[in-house]
Design a protein with these regions (language model features):
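Gram-negative bacterial Sec-dependent N-terminal signal peptides
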Residues: 1-19
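Mature extracellular/passenger domains of Gram-negative fimbrial/pilin and adhesin proteins
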Residues: 17-188
Length: 188
C-alpha cells in the first residue's frame, strides 16, 4: 500500500538560552510505497515550527499552549479508479490523541475532500456518525469515502494543531518536540 508521513517538529528553549540550536539531524521521511501504481503525497511532508520560547506561545485557560495551526495538502493518485481509504498511524497518548512533546497532543482534521474534482464526504467506518465534510483523526482511525465511492484522484487538506502542557514548557535547556503521523492507502 502507499504510505506518506507527516513530520511535525519544534525546538523549545528556556528563556535563558533562547538561541538557535545546530541542526545535526536531517528530517526523517518515509518512502512512498506504491504497489498498483497508487501514490500518497503530502504537499509539505515536514511542518517545522522552528525555535521558540514558552513566552512566544498562546496559553489557554486549561494551561495548555497552542502552536500555530497549519494546513498540509494531501493527494492520492491512482492509475485506475478504486475505492480509497486511508489509515492514520502515529504515536498515541492514553486518550488516543497523537502524542506531541511529553504530554501534548496534535489535533488532526481531514477536510475539503474532493474525488476526481468533486466534493465528497468522508466517514470513519468504526464510528456511529455518518458521512461528514471533515473528520478529526486519531492513530488507528480509517477514513473511507461516502457510499464507498471510487475514484482515481483524491485531494484534501490536513489541519494540524499541536498543543503542549505546562509541564512540557518547563525546560532548562533546548528540547526538541516531534511527532510522525502516517497516512496509508488501504483497502476499505
Amino acid at each position: 500500500m502507499a504510505i506518506s508521513a507527516l513530520l511535525l517538529t519544534g525546538v523549545l528553549a528556556s528563556d535563558a538560552i533562547a538561541q538557535p540550536a545546530p541542526r545535526d539531524q536531517a528530517p526523517r521521511t518515509l518512502p512512498n510505497i506504491a504497489p498498483a501504481g497508487c501514490m500518497v503525497v503530502l504537499g509539505q511532508p515536514t511542518v517545522d515550527y522552528g525555535h521558540f520560547t514558552a513566552g512566544q506561545l498562546n496559553r489557554d485557560t486549561a494551561h495548555r499552549y497552542e502552536l500555530e495551526r497549519r494546513s498540509v495538502p494531501l493527494t492520492v493518485n491512482c492509475p485506475m479508479a478504486r475505492a480509497i481509504a486511508l489509515r492514520v498511524s502515529g504515536p498515541a497518548r492514553h486518550d488516543g490523541a497523537v502524542r506531541f512533546a511529553g504530554a501534548g497532543a496534535v489535533g488532526i482534521v481531514l477536510r475539503n475532500v474532493r474525488v476526481d474534482g468533486d466534493e465528497t464526504r468522508i466517514q470513519n467506518p468504526d464510528s456511529p456518525q455518518g458521512p461528514q465534510a471533515q473528520l478529526t483523526l486519531r492513530p488507528g482511525d480509517t477514513v473511507v469515502l461516502e457510499h464507498r465511492r471510487v475514484g482515481r484522484n483524491l485531494t484534501a487538506q490536513i489541519d494540524v494543531n499541536p498543543e503542549v502542557t505546562d509541564a512540557d514548557v518547563r525546560v532548562n535547556d533546548q528540547t526538541v518536540w516531534s511527532a510522525v503521523v502516517q497516512f496509508e492507502l488501504v483497502n476499505p
